């Protein structure tokens, strides 16, 4: 297929040198657009290592070449259609800002695992920690993880006909993959979590 940014890609070509070339081209594309960072040769080395780790770990189970890919890096941007998501702020100059809470982001990969089930896959290169508490993220904590739940909510917007989603967060350097199951009945709790955070932010007077 033809990528919008780096051109033609031979999806059936698994040659090591060719795949390294693709990694290099993608690395060049992103680093050339992130000029505020001082990129070092070690950064490219790490990127290559992590990509090949995805290809090889678990006998290639999470290698996208072995999956039925629905979409790579889908972007989501949608308003939360709830009354509580409305906001209105008056700025110092008298300007009134009104609207609704919007959620936006990018998901690493969506795959079709069959029987009407899609899998949302998100890779992490860092540690499996809750940075707010410094404690390790367990399966129970991941079930309540706002990011993963927001990904599920976003995918219901992107793929409304799909009822069941698996969400896999893959800590490639700290514990491997953790897969959770989300369905439509989980959405009310997800919206309540988002509402609680949104209202906390709305009620914050300093800083504004």
Indicate residue ranges for each PLM-predicted region.
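A non-catalytic, helix-rich entry segment at domain boundaries
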Residues: 1-88
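Short coil/turn segments at secondary-structure junctions
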Residues: 35-38, 42, 93, 135, ...
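Short, structured helix-loop boundary elements
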Residues: 44, 48, 100, 188-191
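A general secondary-structure signal for short beta-strands and their flanking turns/coil
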Residues: 67-69, 100, 104, 164
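A structural signal for short, well-ordered beta-strand segments
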Residues: 72-74, 109, 167
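Non-catalytic protein-protein interaction segments used by genome-maintenance enzymes to assemble
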Residues: 77-148, 152-155
């Amino acid at each position: 297929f033809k990528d919008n940014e780096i051109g033609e890609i031979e999806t059936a070509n698994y040659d090591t040198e060719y795949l390294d070339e693709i990694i290099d081209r993608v690395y060049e594309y992103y680093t050339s657009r992130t000029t505020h960072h001082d990129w070092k040769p070690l950064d490219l080395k790490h990127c290559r290592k992590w990509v090949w780790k995805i290809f090889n770990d678990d006998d290639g189970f999470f290698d996208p070449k072995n999956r039925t890919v629905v979409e790579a890096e889908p972007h989501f941007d949608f308003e939360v259609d709830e009354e509580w998501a409305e906001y209105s702020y008056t700025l110092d100059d008298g300007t009134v800002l009104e609207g609704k809470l919007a959620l936006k982001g990018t998901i690493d990969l969506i795959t079709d695992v069959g029987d009407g089930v899609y899998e949302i896959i998100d890779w992490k290169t860092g540690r499996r920690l809750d940075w707010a508490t410094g404690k390790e993220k367990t399966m129970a904590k991941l079930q309540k993880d706002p990011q993963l739940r927001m990904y599920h909510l976003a995918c219901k917007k992107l793929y409304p006909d799909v009822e069941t989603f698996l969400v896999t967060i893959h800590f490639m350097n700290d514990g491997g993959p953790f897969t959770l199951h989300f369905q439509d009945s989980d959405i009310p709790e997800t919206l309540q979590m988002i509402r609680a955070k949104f209202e906390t932010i709305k009620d914050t007077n300093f800083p504004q």
